[in-house]
């Protein structure tokens, strides 16, 4: 229980840091007049995939898949716990890392011009006249948090399904339905990332790098708890594969159980 409490505490701390960084102001990067066209896209009020929906998909999808697998395969509580710990760590680390980069880089969004100058008229000093909160949020383009969270949560779901379905082991290779089922979450993550460019909220580099960050954390945290996908036991967490210390002691040969040497043909020598 103590180890579990520590694990939960680490994740709570990371999510706390993530929420804290959400309210910090980013670096105010100087925008040169010749590059203003990059940030002059229209300001879209209604997103294709709102932030709340993105968080719901990224957080609830892996949890729902884990619960469905438990019902179908009747997995034990230990396996469910390990899966929850792995995906929660991936999401927490991803959030902290993505927001940290956002604040340090301070890249303007594609619609930054109309956040800064709502009337479409730029003054000579280039001092923003728009809502300060909207302007500050407009300097958090790189990388895309929609993309990073989508690829973190749904990317983990892909690795989890690939392990459960043995997509890359001898028994599972060549069965296309297994591979399609495993990569479906990644397809959904890609659609979420691309939607941010359609909303003029991110440049393509923002979505691409965000996806890479999310996928890296998804794989790292998955491998912390599960064997490689090519392993024959990839459907089980490491905890379930470890041999308990009590069993190890029972397997050790004792003096009574040690094999005896044959005595035939052995005679006593002279004293």
UniProtKB/Swiss-Prot annotation:
Residues 102-110 are annotated as: Phosphatase sequence motif I. It catalyses: a 1,2-diacyl-sn-glycerol 3-diphosphate + H2O = a 1,2-diacyl-sn-glycero-3-phosphate + phosphate + H(+); a 1,2-diacyl-sn-glycero-3-phosphate + H2O = a 1,2-diacyl-sn-glycerol + phosphate; 1,2-dioctanoyl-sn-glycero-3-diphosphate + H2O = 1,2-dioctanoyl-sn-glycero-3-phosphate + phosphate + H(+); 1,2-dioctanoyl-sn-glycero-3-phosphate + H2O = 1,2-dioctanoyl-sn-glycerol + phosphate. Pfam families: PAP2 (PF01569). Magnesium-independent phospholipid phosphatase. Inhibited by N-ethylmaleimide. Gene3D superfamilies: Phosphatidic acid phosphatase type 2/haloperoxidase. Magnesium-independent phospholipid phosphatase with broad substrate specificity. Preferentially catalyzes the conversion of diacylglycerol pyrophosphate into phosphatidate but can also act on phosphatidate and lysophosphatidate. Phospholipid phosphatases are involved in both the synthesis of lipids and the degradation or generation of lipid-signaling molecules like diacylglycerol. This is Phospholipid phosphatase 4. It comes from Homo sapiens (Human). The gene is PLPP4.
């Amino acid at each position: 229980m103590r180890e579990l409490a520590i694990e939960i505490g680490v994740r709570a701390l990371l999510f706390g840091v993530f929420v804290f960084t959400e309210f910090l102001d980013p670096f105010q990067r100087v925008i040169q007049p010749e590059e203003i066209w990059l940030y002059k896209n229209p300001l879209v009020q209604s997103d294709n995939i709102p932030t709340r929906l993105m968080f719901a998909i990224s957080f609830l999808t892996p949890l729902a898949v884990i619960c469905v697998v438990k019902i179908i395969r009747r997995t034990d509580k230990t396996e469910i716990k390990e899966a929850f710990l792995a995906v929660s760590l991936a999401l927490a680390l991803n959030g902290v890392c993505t927001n940290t980069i956002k604040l340090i880089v301070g890249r303007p969004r594609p619609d930054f011009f109309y956040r800064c100058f709502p009337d479409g008229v730029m003054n000579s000093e280039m001092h923003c006249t728009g809502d300060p909160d909207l302007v500050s949020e407009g300097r958090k383009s790189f990388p895309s948090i929609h993309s990073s969270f989508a690829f973190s949560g749904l990317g983990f779901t892909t690795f989890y399904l690939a392990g459960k379905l043995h997509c890359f082991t001898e028994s599972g290779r060549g069965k296309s339905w297994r591979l399609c089922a495993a990569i479906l979450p990644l397809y959904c993550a890609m659609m979420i990332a691309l939607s941010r460019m359609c909303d003029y909220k991110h440049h393509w580099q923002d979505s691409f790098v965000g996806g890479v960050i999310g996928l890296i954390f998804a794989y790292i945290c998955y491998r912390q708890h599960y064997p490689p996908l090519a392993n024959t036991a990839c459907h089980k967490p490491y905890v379930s594969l470890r041999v308990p210390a009590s069993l190890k002691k029972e397997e050790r040969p004792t003096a009574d159980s040690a094999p005896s040497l044959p005595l035939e043909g052995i005679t006593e020598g002279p004293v």
